[in-house]
UniProtKB/Swiss-Prot annotation:
Membrane topology qualifier: Peripheral membrane protein
Protein name from the UniProt record: Phosphatidylserine decarboxylase proenzyme
Organism: Shewanella sp. (strain MR-4)
Quaternary organization: Heterodimer of a large membrane-associated beta subunit and a small pyruvoyl-containing alpha subunit.
Entry annotation: catalytic residues: 89 (charge relay system), 146 (charge relay system), 252 (charge relay system), 252 (schiff-base intermediate with substrate)
Keyword vocabulary terms for this entry: Cell membrane, Decarboxylase, Lipid biosynthesis, Lipid metabolism, Lyase, Membrane, Phospholipid biosynthesis, Phospholipid metabolism, Pyruvate, Zymogen
Residues modified as Pyruvic acid (Ser): 252
NCBIfam families given in the database record: PS_decarb
Cofactor binding annotation: Binds 1 pyruvoyl group covalently per subunit.
Record-linked HAMAP family: PS_decarb_PSD_B_type1
A GO cellular component annotation in the UniProt record: plasma membrane
Gene name of this polypeptide: psd
Coiled coil: none
Pathway: Phospholipid metabolism; phosphatidylethanolamine biosynthesis; phosphatidylethanolamine from CDP-diacylglycerol: step 2/2
Length: 292
């Protein structure tokens, strides 16, 4: 059965299907939309008591529901200076060191950090010898993405690609999955060095958005596009730890890359398949004052 599912991933018109779902998800169909949301809540056992708007009728479209806000304070941010926090609700897929420009995907599969970052060689060099973490957001999860630490945006890259599903099954069987799919790469300058937040698209993910540029995709393209941003002055975009930086319309995956020696250890319990909750401790940071 797994082989059949993977074969279908290669055969399906994934971009066409995703854009069709996107149009349906954006439509405001009144009672029909409400019925679909109620079905989704029941099917995926979503805890709506955490949502700022807990009633399905409050959402005009499926997209409004997917990108729902949480109640204030429901995800308290760990404010300790030496702690990096989880950026999303989801589950850890993999994490570990970046060795020789390679990132571990699943047993038997690695992929290139250079390819992941849209073949931006200078960016890839900045993360050599550092660490990575891949977090999967299931359809049931909260779909907004937050900053793990404070950072100032320096660059954003749109990388065209496939739209394979990014669930654990495809991660085990599709080589180079996260470096093949359409993605948006945001690079931030932090006190610990560069931080890359890679928002990976997937089958029926209707769009990827950021708080500073709005919807990045759709429309999709065939070329890599890069935007550079000032890191000082009144136009600099600085986001605090725990502040929203983007969102998915439907679940997907976030890959984070960290500079060498930015992370001391991952927090207790942070390991593959561990459930993540935005704002909780993700990693213990190196003491930069004694780095010399």
């Amino acid at each position: 059965m797994d082989k059949v599912k993977i074969a279908l991933q290669y055969m399906l018109p994934k971009h066409l299907l995703s854009r069709l779902v996107g149009k349906l998800a954006a439509s405001e169909a009144g009672a029909l939309t409400t019925a679909a949301i109620k079905w989704f809540i029941k099917q995926y056992k979503i805890d709506m008591s955490e949502a700022a708007q807990s009633e399905p009728e409050a959402y005009k479209s499926f997209n409004d529901f997917f990108t729902r806000a949480l109640k204030p304070g429901i995800r308290p941010i760990n404010t300790a200076a030496n702690i990096m926090v989880h950026p999303v609700d989801g589950a850890v897929s993999q994490l570990g060191p970046i060795k020789d420009g390679r990132i571990f995907q699943a047993k038997g599969h690695h992929y290139s950090s250079l390819t992941l970052l849209g073949d931006q060689a200078e960016d890839a060099k900045r993360f050599e010898g550092g660490d990575f973490a891949t977090i999967y957001l299931a359809p049931k999860d909260y779909h907004r993405i937050h900053m793990p630490i404070k950072g100032t945006l320096s660059k954003m890259t749109y990388v065209p690609g496939e739209l394979f599903s990014v669930n654990p099954l495809t991660a085990r069987h599709v080589p180079g999955l996260f470096a093949r799919n359409e993605r948006v790469v945001a690079i931030f300058e932090t006190e610990l060095g560069p931080l890359a937040m890679v928002l990976v698209g997937a089958t029926i993910v209707a769009s990827i958005e950021t708080v500073w540029a709005g919807t990045i995709t759709p429309p999709t393209g065939k070329q890599v596009f890069t935007w550079e941003y000032p890191t000082v002055g009144p136009d600099a975009i600085t986001l605090d730890k725990g502040e929203e930086m983007g969102r998915f319309k439907l679940g997907s995956t976030v890959v984070m890359l960290f500079a060498k020696e930015a992370i001391d250890t991952f927090a207790e319990g942070v390991e593959p398949e561990a459930v993540t909750r935005m704002g909780q401790a993700f990693a213990n940071l190196k003491d930069q004052s004694s780095a010399d």
